[in-house]
Amino acid sequence: VTSLTRKIGLSLGADTCWPICFEEILGDLAPVVKVGKDEVRFEVERVRIAPFALHAKVDYDLVIDRLTYWYAPAREWIKKSILMDGTYTWNNPWSIESNQKHTAYAAMLALGLPIPETWMVPPKSYEPKADLQVTLGRYADMFDLGEIGKQVGHPSFMKPYDGGGWVGVTKLDDEAGLRDAYEKSGKSLMHVQKGVIPFDRFVRCVGLGPQTILMNYDPSAPLHQRYRTDKDFVSAEQRKHIEDITLTINAFFGWDFNSCEALLKDGTWWPIDFANPCPDSQVTSLHYHFPWLVKAKLRWALFTAATKRKMRMNLDWAPFFEVRERKLGPERRIEEYGRLARAHFDTERFEEFCARELAQLDEVAWQYFGSERAREAIRKKVEQLFPKHEVESFNEHFFQAIQAWRADDKAARAPRLTQHVLAPVAAATGASKPKSPAKKR
């Protein structure tokens, strides 16, 4: 038996609470997993930002990346690490850089998904460039924005073609609103998209590897209340349908971690925002759902690092378009896309790995999220976002939301806990890590 260590790097920006929880639960769990004849242990550290030589060896087996979409030095370091050292990374940095929401809309339209009528309009103004005026003078057509609004239909939305976090999104009820939003859009390249209004249901599905969580979503609520906690808000068939859509998008673009917003109207699910490869991961918005995300990150991180999952640098779209050409009905076609996506994420092998090697994770995480360490991790994020006089009340609010999750989680796991005798697990106060020497492969 060979003892190996896999090293996980966290490439972080403003993320505060989930990295703390990730690190501390991993320390409590102290997993030693079997991969073939090898025993694999894990280390985790936060990636520093510094000058680097292109030939310098990177010793991370996995990097969980939260910076690529906006911070170029981290993105270019990750690209080099993948190319030269085979580092597995969430998410594919080339795909994040090149595939914006605009491409995602076009791709899913090409696969036959119901995407609302969407137009791109040239920006209202431009950054000065040497050939700009010549180009516009020769080739740019005048257009009637009001006529575009009529073709799209109202109500509609104007939003950046590459945006996120609801930044720059304007609801348009009429032509006057459309023209006003365009005048204020500045140099941003914008979409005008038909609104799916009124809708019967608004959901957000997060996919992390082959794992998904579907949440009822209220976009009109304050940020810390948008994710609702009700459970039976869609049928089993609808849940599977949305999960298939989410995993299809993720596999198609090579994103391990992404979210999909979809609206139900008159029996049809309309994906409206699904190029979010750095999804919200903070307790201050996810609250009750936050422990699921931390556990999902741990499972997929340990699996991808332990098994040395290979990074796919090139996207393989052909199998999806081959399904499209089979002229299946809409529901059957999305089922087939979902099957391809689950194969992409090696779902069967992942589930076997979790059942065999990470059986204690649920209990260790349950213990941790009831601890003072978890409360303190929450506090650190609350202190970043809320006025000083509101810190105590909101810290307690989010901690109690997680205690509600713990109550539900314990009840859900009760049948398993009575049927199987759990091996001793590390206490919530911490656990000593194995001290046997380990070598890196």
Regions from the language model: what does each represent?
Residues 3-9:
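Extreme N-terminal starter segment of soluble prokaryotic enzymes
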Residues 12-135, 377-430:
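Conserved N-proximal alpha/beta basic substrate-recognition cap immediately N-terminal to
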Residues 60-64, 204-207, 268-281:
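A short beta-strand motif that forms the metal-chelation/ATP-contact edge
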Residues 68-69, 274-290:
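Glycine-rich phosphate/pyrophosphate-binding beta-alpha loops
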Residues 108-109, 116, 136-167, 187-198:
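ATP-grasp fold ATP-binding core
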Residues 162-253:
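Phosphate-binding site of ATP-dependent enzymes
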Residues 224-271, 295, 301, 305, ...:
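A long amphipathic alpha-helix within ATP-dependent nucleotide-binding catalytic cores
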Residues 306-441:
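Peripheral (often C-terminal) accessory segments that flank ATP-dependent C-N-forming ligase machineries
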